[in-house]
Amino acid sequence: MKKLIIRWQRLLDNNKTCPRCRKTEKEIEKAYKKLKEVFSPIGIEVVLDKREMSMDVFKTNPLVSNQIWIMDKPIEEWLNANSGKSRCCDVCDDEECRTIELSGKTYESIPEALIIKACLLAAADLISPKLLNVPRGTLKIF
């Protein structure tokens, strides 16, 4: 079975994280569950790799917190988006944290729809004609 790997890292200091990372975590979990269900029948296993950053690591480069990679490429590359930054909160020591800029909109937390879209684009690279030979009605699209 081929693997579609989603890697996400965020600041976690004494079990505390910022609101935007907390929201992204909820969104990535929803996307992960849907993607697992959709890709399993065509032989693609979805793997979610969550990583924690200490405050010391965060302080060296706050813009790598709340970052998602899909198949070792930043989500921004899949979506043709840009990364940005904006002031966050006291958990982050008021650092400027990562945002995504896409089609004139800035996202402080990453919505489920963008995660799914990027994963669909990545999955297209994994799909071979043989994988598409599934019985009609097997795939349930969300």
What is the meaning of each model-derived region?
Residues 49:
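Acidic/histidine-rich catalytic cores of soluble enzymes
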Residues 1-46, 54, 58-63, 67-71, ...:
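Non-globular targeting/processing and membrane-anchoring segments
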